[in-house]
Design a protein with these regions (language model features):
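Conserved alpha/beta enzyme-core scaffold
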Residues: 2-169
Length: 169
């Protein structure tokens, strides 16, 4: 695994160096990397959160601006919510500009042959990853030994990940 592996405390030190009001993008539904989101929320006063179908448990305080095309249960009580009406089939295009990530959080399997899998929830993340690579965004993977390695569009080369954090959930 050639990715820089750190623990959650070290991740918080990295995140405290982030300036401005970054947009953090991650998967929703069953693969939301909640420990990573909690670390982001502890370190950043104000940030934008782009997630399709955010589950209960994501940060919803005033300094977190939810941006989504599908209001999941985690966004319904957010103090700041920007809903963008869009067909889900067109949602990946939003990651080229309007939802372009400054920080991309992935929830992945452990590596196999130089790649990880986004496992059970891929959604629009391949488009977000391509945008992150083009923009030089920070890509952080929550590497979870319990996440299955699933083939398909959710395969990610480990070279595309800047930081890995092992979290077994």
């Amino acid at each position: 695994f050639v990715v820089r592996m750190i623990n959650l405390a070290d991740l918080e030190r990295v995140l405290k160096g982030v300036t401005g009001r970054p947009r953090v993008v991650c998967a929703g539904s069953g693969a939301t990397p909640l420990p990573l989101l909690d670390a982001v929320d502890r370190c950043l006063e104000t940030w934008r959160f782009a997630c399709v179908n955010a589950p209960v448990g994501v940060p919803t305080r005033k300094g977190v601006i939810h941006q989504t095309v599908f209001i999941g249960p985690g966004s319904r009580h957010a103090e700041n919510l920007e809903y963008v009406p869009c067909r889900l089939s067109l949602a990946p295009r939003l990651y080229e500009d309007r939802f372009a990530p400054d920080i991309l959080l992935l929830h992945t399997s452990t590596p196999h042959n130089g790649a990880v899998s986004m496992g059970i929830e891929v959604q629009v993340l391949p488009a977000a990853l391509e945008s992150a690579k083009r923009r030089g965004a920070l890509v952080i993977a929550q590497v979870n030994p319990s996440m299955p390695y699933v083939f398909g569009d959710g395969i990610v080369d480990v070279d595309d990940i800047d930081i890995g954090v092992i979290v077994d959930t």
